[in-house]
Amino acid sequence: MIPVVHSRVDLTLLHPKFKERLELFFGDGRVANKVTVVSGCRSYAEQKRLYTKYRAGRGNLAANPDWKRPGGFFYGSFHQEQPDGYSYAVDLRITGRVSRSIVTSVARRYGIRPTVKGEWWHFQPRNENDWFPSVSFPDNDQPEPAVD
C-alpha cells in the first residue's frame, strides 16, 4: 500500500513498474509509516493549470506541459500523463522520525531517485532514457511497448 496525505492525491496513472517499486519502498522498515505521498499523477489540464499559475507568479515551479523533452517521447512534468498513458513521478513528505538522506538512500535501493535539483521530495523511477537501476527490485527488464 502506498500512503497518501489525502484522498485527492491521484496514483491511478502510475506506471505499474513504478507502483511496484513504491510499494516495496514504503514497506521498507526504515521508512514505513514515516513518509507519505503528497503529489502524484496529473492530467494535462492540471499540469497546464499549475504551469499557468507559476508563470503568473502565483504558484510553485511547474513544468510546461507542452514542452517536449529531449528524446522526443516525454512531455513536461513526469507527474503528468505521458503518451503511453502513465505518470512517472511522486512528491514525498516526511511524517515521522527519519532524515531526508535515509529516505533518499532507501528509495535508491528500489530504483527511485530525486531528479529535480533543489526539490529533494520529487522522486522518479526513470529519466527520458531508461529506468534507474535497483538493487532490491526484481526487475525482469522487459522492453517497453512503442507508442505512436
Segments and roles (model prediction):
Residues K19-E23, Q47-Y51, R100, T104:
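Extracytoplasmic/secreted envelope proteins and their assembly/folding machinery
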Residues G57-D148:
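Catalytic cores and adjacent binding grooves of peptidoglycan-active enzymes
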Residues F26-K68:
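Extended, low-complexity, intrinsically disordered C-terminal regulatory tails
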Residues M1-S39:
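Active-site acidic/histidine clusters and adjacent loop/turn architecture
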Residues P3, D10, N33, S43, ...:
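Alpha-helical protein-protein interaction elements
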Residues L11-L14, L22-L24, L50, L61, ...:
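Generic detector of leucine side chains in alpha-helical contexts
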Residues L13, C41-Q47, G96-V98:
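Acidic-and-aromatic substrate-binding clefts and catalytic sites of carbohydrate-active enzymes
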